[in-house]
């Protein structure tokens, strides 16, 4: 039961992606690790243009399906060591490690 609560606290309920809190935790670990062993990493920020219009025209259920679709597509584009997070609304971040 505790593992489920822990997972739920660190993941977005809609997409299953990491949430902002987990992204920040992993970024902090990378920065700390970088002090000892300099490495290269990147943070990508993505915002879906026109997403509000999708919700307004087609409803939130369609908007939710779009967000889930974007999440699934992003998962196919990164390595297992990378972190994809939904920051909220239509904002995503990818931590390339």
Region locations from a protein language model:
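Conserved long alpha-helical elements within nucleotide-processing catalytic cores of c-di-GMP signaling
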Residues: 6-10, 16-43, 49-79, 85-94
């Amino acid at each position: 039961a505790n593992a489920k609560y822990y997972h739920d606290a660190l993941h977005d309920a809609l997409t299953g992606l990491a949430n902002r809190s987990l992204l920040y935790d992993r970024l902090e670990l990378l920065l700390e690790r970088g002090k000892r062993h300099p490495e290269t990493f990147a943070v990508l920020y993505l915002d879906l243009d026109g997403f509000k219009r999708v919700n307004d025209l087609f409803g939130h259920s369609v908007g939710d399906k779009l967000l889930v679709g974007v999440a699934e597509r992003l998962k196919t584009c990164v390595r297992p060591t990378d972190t994809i997070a939904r920051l909220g609304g239509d904002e995503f971040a990818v931590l390339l490690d």
